[in-house]
């Protein structure tokens, strides 16, 4: 905004808005849900939460995969992730904290949603998303999905790739979320 300040004191500033310079679209009704396999280090989980919160992801689900080193978390870890998320949301000037959960049983989260799995086996690019679609995006675990992951977890899914570049799972989570958020604008 371009403002004209008429007065100020210790507690308030009074002024008039002369011009709105930046206009943004309302994207508050366009949801992004991401399922991420538990990484092998807590610092990676913290990075994922921080960056996905900055990108305005609505729900972040961590799940143990067959190859996950970390299989569970406690309240102290969850509180730390919440604090990281809040700081990231404040920094990015958003108003809504993402829901952050650890789920051992992913099936209730997946119900009534189109599942798109981000994997290296297919070369499709990210589709343009219907803003009203219930789509949940799933990012691979470290060392990729196993055959058991495919058989047990994903029955009705599409495979998507960001291309030939092999990305770490935390980088893929961030790149994918950013691409999705920008496609919904």
Regions found by a protein language model. Name each.
Residues 1-24:
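N-terminal positively charged helical leader segments and presequences
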Residues 20, 64-68, 164:
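Short, ordered loop/turn segments at secondary-structure junctions
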Residues 25-114:
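RNA substrate-binding interface of SAM-dependent RNA methyltransferases
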Residues 39, 121, 165:
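Active-site beta-loop-alpha junctions enriched in small/polar residues
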Residues 104-111, 123-126, 166-167:
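A short acidic, often aromatic-flanked loop/helix-cap motif at beta-alpha or helix-coil junctions
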Residues 115-151, 156-162:
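Active-site/ligand-binding-proximal alpha/beta "capping" segment
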Residues 147-185:
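Structured adenosyl-cofactor binding patch, chiefly the S-adenosyl-L-methionine
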């Amino acid at each position: 905004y371009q403002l004209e300040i008429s007065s100020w004191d210790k507690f308030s500033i009074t002024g008039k808005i002369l011009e709105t310079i930046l206009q943004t679209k309302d994207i508050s009704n366009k949801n992004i849900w991401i399922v991420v396999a538990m990484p092998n280090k807590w610092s990676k989980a913290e990075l994922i939460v921080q960056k996905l919160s900055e990108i305005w992801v609505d729900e972040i689900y961590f799940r143990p995969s067959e190859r996950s080193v970390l299989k569970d978390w406690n309240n102290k870890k969850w509180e730390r992730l919440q604090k990281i998320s809040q700081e990231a949301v404040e920094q990015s000037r958003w108003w809504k904290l993402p829901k952050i959960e650890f789920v051992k049983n992913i099936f209730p989260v997946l119900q009534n949603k189109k599942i798109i799995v981000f994997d290296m086996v297919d070369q499709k690019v990210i589709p343009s998303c219907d803003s009203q679609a219930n789509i949940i995006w799933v990012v691979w675990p470290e060392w990729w999905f196993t055959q058991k992951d495919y058989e047990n977890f994903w029955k009705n899914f599409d495979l998507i790739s960001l291309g030939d570049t092999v990305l770490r799972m935390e980088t893929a989570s961030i790149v994918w979320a950013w691409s999705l958020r920008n496609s919904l604008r």
